[in-house]
């Protein structure tokens, strides 16, 4: 697994190393990019002889190329400011001129970053649109500076064409090569132009014997050779390529072969695996296999995978097939017959046979080599099986899952004393009953929590009719006790003993209210109004696991009508109580930081382009600032 991890890391790392010198996009609000733009704009304003300076409006594009030298290439938009060229102000201290009269422009620049974090301009082209007038183009090129240019620049066309012709004319390769991809290009202004280009070449289907130079019918071969070249060209002032040199590295292609002619008597040819031509050759092959094999049973050809024939001084057959063990033994059968059936779990062989036949001499020379196929590993392991993924089967411990109602029933049988004596429950829950009827029946009973689960059991409390539980609201602290206390479906007074009246009416009953920091409404319905309570008691010999949700029959007890009515409800297998007194309420706003989820993976940083528009500082005229307070008198402030 460690080896696989290392290989994956290397596969991710190698492309990144190969692309180290490629241009990387930058955020248009990047500080270092702004410094480069500042240098370029100051250089442009310094070249103006009259008029106003230009102020940065917005950076629209930005790339960075790291290598032996670091270059910044970017585009930015400018607007005419209200500071003159001779004012001595920097462009940051100027405001925009009125939009109707102001000139606008866009500049494309390439700057080199030096070791002292200073920038030098390699090239800059600005297209200026006056407020009223045609576009004016201003170009600047650093004399003697080698700087990158666009690989799509039209000026590279003649240089690249000459580079490919130079390679084809000075190599001994049998085929012509064509231009693949231009990876980078640099230019230097001298008494002419120097170019440094890195490009790839690919082999075409045109041979040098048939084509003296590249033709429009020459297309790159998918599996042909390719290479990468570095070329240096010099173009004089007359736009003529006066010098060129290159160095290339070759990468051989995969599965490169020449197509054989259709009529080739001595060449191997593929034949169908079900061709009748193979019948005799297959017969000799299986006979040779059974003769050389010491196995007690005969083998029979099951599948022919591929076959070729070649005309030599006779015919040579090369066949690959799979042979399987049959039920016919060599002791009881003199030879293999067609009615011999193969064994379902018999041995299988992967065989390669060479059969040389000379019919006019009745000469047959078969040669068979076989390898045993391990069928057991194929049967036991599914496709894609890996020993690293073999599951470890862990025998689970024997345990018994017991539901709360079953625990109560067992406790009754083990401790009969609980049936008669009162059980004091400390259910610290005071609920306010909202009654919809004048008479509401209350039942004192011993059940699980509050309500009648069984006539006797753990806990006790009042039981209300199911129809009267449509509106309930809980006031006060809702204290939960972990052992034998709590409330179930029925809500009532948790204090008291398990003795009381069978029936009583209480129309105007005042319940004691307890002030609480929270008021939580409890919604109940006549159809589904069951809240399960986990009861922890004496359960020696049982292992309590969270059971699956299962229906529980809840008895409403004997009413005045004299019959028992059962209600089926779904009981939650887990404790639905929440210890609100231990966990404080945290009110979270939807837009707050705590409400937002944290991603498992870091978000990909997106490059923001174009950048934020520049907001110049309004520069006021000093004369106006002094005249604003010229009429101020100190006596006015003292009066």
From Swiss-Prot:
Residue spans of biased composition, Polar residues class: 522-537
UniProt domain Cystatin kininogen-type: residue ranges: 28-132, 151-254, 273-376
Entry keyword annotation includes Transcription: no
Alphabetical UniProt keywords: Blood coagulation, Disulfide bond, Glycoprotein, Hemostasis, Inflammatory response, Phosphoprotein, Protease inhibitor, Repeat, Secreted, Signal, Thiol protease inhibitor, Vasoactive, Vasodilator
Region named Disordered: 438-462, 476-547
Residues listed as glycosylation sites in the UniProt record: 82, 169, 205, 294, 529
Residue(s) at site: Cleavage: 387-388
Modifications after synthesis and translation: Bradykinin is released from kininogen by plasma kallikrein.
Residues bearing PTM Phosphoserine: 332
Biased composition annotated in UniProt, kind: Basic residues: 482-502
Entry GO CC: extracellular region; extracellular space; perikaryon
GO biological process: blood coagulation; Factor XII activation; negative regulation of blood coagulation; negative regulation of cell adhesion; negative regulation of lymphocyte proliferation; negative regulation of proteolysis; negative regulation of T cell proliferation; positive regulation of endothelial cell proliferation
Recorded superkingdom: Eukaryota
Compartment(s): Secreted, Extracellular space
Disulfide bonds: 28-609, 83-94, 107-126, 142-145, 206-218, 229-248, 264-267, 328-340, 351-370
Compositionally biased intervals (Basic and acidic residues): 503-519
First and last residue of the signal peptide: 1-18
Molecular function GO terms recorded: cysteine-type endopeptidase inhibitor activity; protease binding
Summary of the tissues where the protein is detected: Plasma.
Other observations noted: Rats express four types of kininogens: the classical HMW/LMW kininogens and two additional LMW-like kininogens: T-I and T-II.
Function, as annotated: Kininogens are inhibitors of thiol proteases. HMW-kininogen plays an important role in blood coagulation by helping to position optimally prekallikrein and factor XI next to factor XII; HMW-kininogen inhibits the thrombin- and plasmin-induced aggregation of thrombocytes. LMW-kininogen inhibits the aggregation of thrombocytes. LMW-kininogen is in contrast to HMW-kininogen not involved in blood clotting.
UniProt-recorded name of the protein: Kininogen-1
Gene: Kng1
């Amino acid at each position: 697994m460690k080896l696989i991890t290392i290989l994956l890391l290397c596969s991710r790392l190698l492309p990144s190393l190969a692309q180290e010198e490629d241009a990387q996009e930058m955020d248009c609000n990047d500080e270092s990019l702004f410094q480069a733009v500042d240098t370029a704009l100051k250089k442009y304003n310094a070249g103006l002889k009259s008029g106003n300076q230009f102020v940065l409006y917005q950076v629209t594009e930005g790339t960075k190329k790291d290598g032996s030298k670091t270059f910044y290439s970017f585009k930015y938009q400018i607007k005419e400011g209200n500071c003159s060229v001779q004012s001595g102000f920097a462009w940051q201290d100027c405001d925009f001129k009125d939009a109707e009269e102001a000139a606008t422009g866009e500049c494309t620049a390439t700057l080199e970053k030096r070791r002292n974090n200073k920038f030098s301009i390699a090239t800059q082209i600005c297209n200026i649109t006056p407020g009223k007038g045609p576009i004016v183009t201003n170009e600047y090129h650093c004399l003697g500076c080698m700087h990158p240019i666009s690989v799509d620049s039209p000026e590279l066309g003649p240089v690249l064409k000459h580079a490919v012709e130079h390679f084809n004319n000075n190599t001994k390769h049998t085929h012509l090569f064509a231009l693949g991809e231009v990876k980078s290009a640099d230019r230097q202004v001298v008494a002419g132009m120097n170019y440094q280009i890195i490009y790839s070449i690919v082999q075409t289907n045109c041979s040098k014997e048939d084509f003296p130079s590249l033709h429009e019918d020459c297309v790159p071969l998918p599996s042909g050779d390719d290479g990468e070249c570095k070329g240096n060209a010099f173009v004089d002032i007359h736009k003529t390529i006066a010098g060129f040199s290159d160095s290339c590295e070759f990468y051989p292609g995969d599965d490169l072969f020449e197509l054989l002619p259709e009529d080739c008597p001595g060449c191997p040819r593929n034949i169908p695996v079900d061709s009748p031509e193979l019948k005799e050759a297959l017969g000799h092959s299986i006979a040779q296999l059974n003769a050389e094999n010491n196995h007690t049973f005969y083998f029979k050809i099951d599948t022919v995978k591929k076959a070729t024939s070649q005309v030599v001084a006779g015919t040579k057959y090369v066949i690959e097939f799979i042979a399987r063990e049959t039920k016919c033994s060599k002791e009881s059968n003199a030879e293999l017959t067609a009615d011999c059936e193969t064994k379902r779990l018999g041995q299988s062989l992967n065989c390669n046979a060479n059969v040389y036949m000379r019919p006019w001499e009745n000469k047959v020379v078969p040669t068979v080599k076989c390898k045993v196929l391990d069928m057991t590993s194929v049967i036991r392991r599914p496709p894609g099986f890996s020993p690293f993924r073999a599951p470890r089967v862990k025998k689970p411990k024997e345990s018994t899952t017991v539901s709360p109602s079953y625990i109560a029933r067992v406790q009754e049988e083990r401790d009969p004393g609980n049936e008669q004596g009162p059980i004091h429950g400390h259910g610290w829950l005071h609920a306010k009953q909202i009654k919809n009827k004048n008479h509401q029946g209350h039942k004192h009973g011993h059940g699980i929590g509050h309500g009648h689960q069984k006539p006797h059991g753990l806990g006790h409390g009042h039981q209300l009719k199911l129809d009267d539980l449509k509106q309930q609201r809980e006031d006060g602290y809702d204290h939960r006790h972990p052992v034998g206390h709590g409330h179930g479906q029925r809500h009532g007074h948790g204090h008291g003993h398990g003795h009381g009246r069978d029936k009583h009416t209480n129309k105007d009953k005042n319940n004691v209210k307890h002030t609480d920091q929270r008021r939580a409404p409890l919604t109940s319905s006549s159809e589904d109004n069951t809240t399960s309570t986990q009861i922890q008691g004496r359960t020696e010999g049982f292992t309590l696991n969270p059971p699956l949700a299962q229906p529980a029959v809840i008895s409403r007890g004997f009413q005045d009508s004299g019959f028992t009515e059962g209600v089926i409800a779904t009981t939650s297998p887990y404790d639905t109580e929440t210890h609100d007194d231990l966990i404080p309420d945290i009110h979270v706003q939807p837009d707050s930081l705590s409400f937002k989820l944290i991603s498992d993976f870091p978000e990909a940083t997106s490059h923001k382009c174009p950048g934020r528009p520049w907001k110049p500082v309004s520069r006021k005229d000093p004369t106006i600032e002094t005249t604003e307070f010229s009429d101020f008198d100190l006596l006015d402030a003292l009066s």
